[in-house]
Amino acid sequence: MAQEKKKGGVLPPDGGWGWMIVAGCFVVTVCTRAVTRCISIFFVEFQMHFAKDYSGTAWIHSLVDCTTMLCAPLGSLIGNQLSCRIAVILGGFLASVGLVLSSFATSLEYLYATLGLLTGLGFALCYTPAIAMVGIYFCERKALAYGIAMSGSGIGTFILAPVVQLLIEHYSWRGALLILGGFVLNLCVCGALLRPIILKEEEACPLPVDSECGYSVKPPTLNGGPTRSAASDAKQRCFQSMQEYHFLLMPDFLVLAGSFLLLASGCSLPFVYLVPYALDVGVGHQHAAFLMSILGVIDIVGNITFGWLTDRRCLKKYRNICYMFAVGMEGLCCLFIPLLRTFVWLVPFSVLYGYFDGAYVALIPVVTSDVVGRQYLSSALGVVYFLHAVPYLVSPPIGGWLVDTTGTYTATFFLSGFALISSSLLLFSVAIIRYCQRNQKKNSLSKIPKLVSCEGKQVDYYPPKNKDLMLIIPATS
């Protein structure tokens, strides 16, 4: 903690208004991630109305996810340069407009632009700044705070999935999208809660310290004092921007980034194809939507329990292992789903997959913060979610193409499972290599002769195999 205060100049309050930040981030995850998950419920309606196949409608979900992640650095940039409050309010307005315009769609291409691109852009401006604010307000209880905040995705899915299905049945898919547009407008209210930190240390300090980057900024003088030129200010801003992305040179972050790429390739497929798969094997519409609700509520348990557990002192240093375990188990669940062909058997899948999904989702910002530090968290999260963009874009259409080609969902769920397991194995392999390197380094250091002093002269001491003997050789200068 002392070291973090020295670097960043400030300490997070770990409570107080921070819990309002958690509440705001909770609603942001409901309005962004839960709504994105529920878009798959519209797929059957879109296929019937526009006479398109699986791969064509899957592009809608891909575009929402891809745009949300691809524009995540833009959300971080607006949050850093202006404020997180402005970013979230602007994003909420754009997302609401996108959903309302989607209710007037006349073609799938129209939905690609409104529901896919415009709504996804609004979600991007909201998601990253809100998550970063939680990390700024919390340190000791960071994992628990993130667990509560990210549980909004599961709670939202549990509530919205059957509600959206009922809205479609009573008001058609157009009316359901219009109502969702009004609901998502609550993001603007959440943005108003994201109050920047004002600390007493900054008021007492003659040179204010930037809470994100850790450097002192000298204010310009007004009465005849020296002022920096515009060119100097531009260079300073450029240097500060470069410093914000210094974490890209960290080897640990590069490995984590590779793992995220594999993770993103497989994690979205079950959410896209669980309901269509259930309908294909004969499960009713309400029961299929209820599977998403079960997945969502168990997601909450995974969010909070893993967040609370990894904040314990005995597990805090094993957060990476907990993350690897959750991702690996999620992959195993996907490998077994083609064997589950009734509602009774699909319920355990929703329970297990939802739990481990909630676990790793809550740990993504925590693990990222542990690797790059709090001062780089906002920019790092922008890059992390940016890495999800291309896999989110291509994996659902590839899954739909596999369904159209093979006539079954087996290959699609196998693709998801192997991608998730590979993500976990990458981190596990690097951890094993690091462990072996540390042991090898310890063994090599134990063999290096130690320098000791004997009667004022420097000598080399070699510990002999026989403990009763000591060999002392004068050191050569």
From Swiss-Prot:
Chief place where the protein resides: membrane
Parts of the chain that traverse the membrane: 10-30, 58-78, 86-106, 116-136, 148-168, 178-198, 253-273, 289-309, 320-340, 344-364, 383-403, 413-433
Pfam families membership: MFS_1 (PF07690)
Cytoplasmic side: 1-9, 434-477
GO molecular function, one term: transmembrane transporter activity
Localization annotation: Cell membrane; Basolateral cell membrane
Topology of the protein relative to the lipid bilayer: Multi-pass membrane protein
Reaction catalyzed: creatine(in) = creatine(out); guanidinoacetate(in) = guanidinoacetate(out)
The keyword Calcium is annotated on this UniProt entry: no
A cellular component annotation (GO) from this entry: plasma membrane
Transcription keyword on record: no
GO biological process, one term: creatine transmembrane transport
Keywords, ordered alphabetically: Cell membrane, Membrane, Transmembrane, Transmembrane helix
Protein role: Functions as a transporter for creatine and as well for its precursor guanidinoacetate. Transport of creatine and GAA is independent of resting membrane potential and extracellular Na(+), Cl(-), or pH. Contributes to the process of creatine biosynthesis and distribution.
Family: Belongs to the major facilitator superfamily. Monocarboxylate porter (TC 2.A.1.13) family.
Record protein name field: Monocarboxylate transporter 12-B
Gene name of this polypeptide: slc16a12b
